[in-house]
Structures are given as structure tokens and as C-alpha cells.
Amino acid sequence: MKEFDYIIIGGGCSGLSLAYELEINNKLKNKSLAIIEPRTDYKRDKTWSFWKTINHNFEDCVIKNWNNFSINISSKSHELKTKNFPYQTVNSDLFYKKINNELSKNKNIYLFKNVNEINTKDALIFNSAPESNANKSKLWQHFQGVEIETE
């Protein structure tokens, strides 16, 4: 069984972001990396939204920016401008394609999908898989909406 220098458990946003940053910053030169992901394929399965407080490498995956928002309570409304800290939404499909395209150029990076066992001997392991009690948070941000596409 092949041995790896690094193993990332979880090939979602966190795990793939870590692998991407290691690769583009030349930290994987002469190193092997295994990414373990339970899903069998990547598709647009979600969007990620956040306040942009620093520059990041995924501007080309951003599908929407908001520079203001409003807080509405009963009959009151207050609009806030956030030009310096826009709220951004990243499309997971664009993100997965960008990352996997870059990582596939390095023959020492292996993406294992739907794997039950891997040799972890002498490997540095990064576990980005959520803990089983991760959804017990008291604060949850959720948006409901409809996407409409027109020709």
C-alpha cells in the first residue's frame, strides 16, 4: 500500500482549499498528498457565502457580491453599506473545477473517493471532516431564495 507525506481527510471546501494553497505555494514539491473524500463525484451541491475581509484566490468562483444589506424588524428597516467588506457567494461547482484542475497537474496528489482504508504510517494528517456534533451550534445562518435563469 502506498505511503503519503500528507493526508487530508475531507475533500470539501476546507480540505480542497488547504490542498490548493499547499500546491500553489509550492509546499508539495517532492511530497505526496492523499485527499480522502466520501462522495463519488463533484457537482454544484452548495454555495458558500462570507464577508470578504482579506483577498483570496477564489474571486473567479464568486457568483455574487453585495455591498449593502438591510436589517428589517417589524416595521423598521436599516440599510448598511459594506463596500470595504463585501458579502460574497462562491459557487461550489466553479470552486471544485478550479481546484481539481490545478491539483490534477501534480502527479503526487491523489484524490481517493469512497475509500475505506488508507496507509497513514508516517503521514501528517489534516482532518477537515466535521465532527458528529457540529450541527449543535446555537447560531445558524440560513438564507432561503429562488434562483431564476432567463435567456
Language-model features, listed with the residues they occupy:
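Nucleotide donor/acceptor-binding cores
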Residues: 4, 30-31, 123-124
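N-terminal FAD cofactor-binding segment of flavoenzymes
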Residues: 17, 21-77, 94, 144, ...
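A conserved beta-strand/loop capping segment in the N-terminal third of enzymes
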Residues: 50-113, 118-122
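Anionic group-transfer/hydrolysis microenvironments
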Residues: 7, 39, 129-130
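Generic domain-boundary/flexible-linker signal
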Residues: 44, 82, 136-137
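Beta1/beta-strand and adjacent pyrophosphate-binding region of the FAD-binding site
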Residues: 1-14, 34
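Conserved Rossmann-like nucleotide-cofactor binding loop
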Residues: 14, 41, 131
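Predominantly flavin-linked oxidoreductase catalytic cores and closely associated redox partners
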Residues: 11, 21, 25, 102-151
